[in-house]
Amino acid sequence: MTKFVFVTGGVVSSLGKGIAAASLAAILESRGLKVTLLKLDPYINVDPGTMSPFQHGEVFVTEDGAETDLDLGHYERFITAKMRKVNNFTTGQIYESVIRKERRGEYLGKTVQVIPHITNEIQDYIHRGAEGFDVALVEIGGTVGDIESLPFLEAARQLSLRAGRNAAAFVHLTLVPYLASAGELKTKPTQHSVQKLREIGISPDALLCRADRQIPDDERAKISLFSNVQEDAVISVWDADTIYKIPQMLHDQGLDRIVCEKLALSPKPADLSMWTKLVHSLENPKDSVTIGMVGKYVDLTESYKSLTEALRHAGIHTESRVNIEYLDSEEIENTGPQCLAKYDAILVPGGFGKRGVEGKIASARFARESKIPYLGICLGMQVALIEYARDVAGLTKANSTEFDADTEQPVVALINEWQNHDGKVERRDANSDLGGTMRLGAQTCAVKPGTLAAEIYGSEVTERHRHRYEANNHYLGRVEDAGLIVSARTPTESLCEIMELPRTVHPWYVGVQYHPEFKSTPRDGHPLFISFIKAALAHKHAGQAKK
């Protein structure tokens, strides 16, 4: 039978519930338990796919094509289990499901209410995602006290009651702020947060107390007394310079022991040696590179969370510190790309919309002409294709129909029909809904022998997608004749997956239509990013040799 650990948050949002839950899951997995994580989001959107990155941050895509919360990216980076659609659901999905059942008459004429119908549906979703695992950690989004979170907290309380003794544990993450004017940590917000949770009928088994410093024993004793939580279960979680230190921090204070005792589990001792090695590699690099990332969401770096982590993972596996500088593509559009000359490599990530796109195109051209390593992801590949078509292949009016619906030379265009991850044919047009109508999830394709892509991936590549627009096959022949290499295509539609420049022309210039960052983990890194960082190191050293 699956055991449950519910992770809640109090006082303020963005305390790091996802990191805390993923870190605890990593410790439990190291103890030999089969572990998964679920994220319950209390917003009414069906999924985050149509939400602005400024509102929500990154949208993480699973192997089976779900557009999910960025916390699922943390989950995959901390444990070995792959996330699926069932690992993330929202208030919107719950209500949509209940209303469909009501319309079909499944409630037999009863008045449909939050309790029991909504809360039962939430529990059904939780059980579905947890099936087949020893322990499921369930992160409840939002903050205790928010009206949106109440049905999820009530469902967690009911599930705990129904599951019986030793079947569920509650871990509450809260803030202990430091008041500089008073020169002390303040525990009152935590006391009130726990009190609010207990009013709902939930008594936490452990408190994770976030602060900018370690919390002294006397303050932990005070929190214990007023929150009715054992003193050894009041865990101090202070700011760390890398999230990969958190598993060791929680283990050193016995959080996994407390949870295992509550759940009546007796697994083998934890082995966190892998995390120790990762942290050592991060803290003891032998070299460094600086990457210029040209995007439109640079004011909120959460929009590129998986990408940032993927670059850091590549740094771990190349013994290098990867410094990332975020550059606004609109500023480059206005002032020119000369500011990119100082970087060891240039990366243009995915994105949507016309704003700042000419700055990205200019960045791709600068990287190509200056022989600076370039990686274009999704839109980053498309702008590189547009630039090459305009400036090399003679298609001077080349553009994407995303930016100019009436362009005379649509080298990038809307996909009307494609196969999803399980082979089902999907169709859309310009009038289709925005939500859930993209090419989503993992797909496999063959790689052209003798290319840089083949050197990186081998003969085959499986990566995750999230896009509506593709390179237009009608124009690819012209661009290939001008020297660009299409080094991977989809097997059915022959859509461009990877493009590159010959190494006789440029040392490392690659564009990919998919999102490789979603598959990178600190354990293994990702071959594309590792190759990219190696190219950046080579460019840096070549520049130093010339001086």
Curated annotation (Swiss-Prot):
Reaction it catalyzes: UTP + L-glutamine + ATP + H2O = CTP + L-glutamate + ADP + phosphate + 2 H(+); L-glutamine + H2O = L-glutamate + NH4(+); UTP + NH4(+) + ATP = CTP + ADP + phosphate + 2 H(+)
Pathway named in the protein's UniProt entry: Pyrimidine metabolism; CTP biosynthesis via de novo pathway; CTP from UDP: step 2/2
Subunit structure and binding partners: Homotetramer.
Residues annotated for L-glutamine binding in this entry: 351, 379-382, 402, 468
Keywords: ATP-binding, Glutamine amidotransferase, Ligase, Magnesium, Metal-binding, Nucleotide-binding, Pyrimidine biosynthesis
Control of this protein's activity: Allosterically activated by GTP, when glutamine is the substrate; GTP has no effect on the reaction when ammonia is the substrate. The allosteric effector GTP functions by stabilizing the protein conformation that binds the tetrahedral intermediate(s) formed during glutamine hydrolysis. Inhibited by the product CTP, via allosteric rather than competitive inhibition.
Role description: Catalyzes the ATP-dependent amination of UTP to CTP with either L-glutamine or ammonia as the source of nitrogen. Regulates intracellular CTP levels through interactions with the four ribonucleotide triphosphates.
Gene Ontology BP annotations: 'de novo' CTP biosynthetic process; pyrimidine nucleobase biosynthetic process
Annotated coiled-coil segments of the chain: none
Protein residues bound to UTP: 13, 186-191, 222
Active-site residues from the entry: 378 (nucleophile), 515, 517
Protein name: CTP synthase
PANTHER family: CTP SYNTHASE, CTP SYNTHASE-RELATED
Database matches in Pfam families: CTP_synth_N, GATase
Binding positions (CTP): 13, 146-148, 186-191, 222
InterPro entries linked to this entry: Class_I_gatase-like (IPR029062), CTP_synthase (IPR004468), CTP_synthase_N (IPR017456), GATASE (IPR017926), GATase1_CTP_Synthase (IPR033828), P-loop_NTPase (IPR027417)
Any one GO CC term of the record: cytosol
GO molecular function list: ATP binding; CTP synthase activity; glutaminase activity; identical protein binding; metal ion binding
Annotated region (Amidoligase domain), positions in chain: 1-265
Residues bound to ATP: 14-19, 71
UniProt family annotation: Belongs to the CTP synthase family.
Binding site for Mg(2+): 71, 139
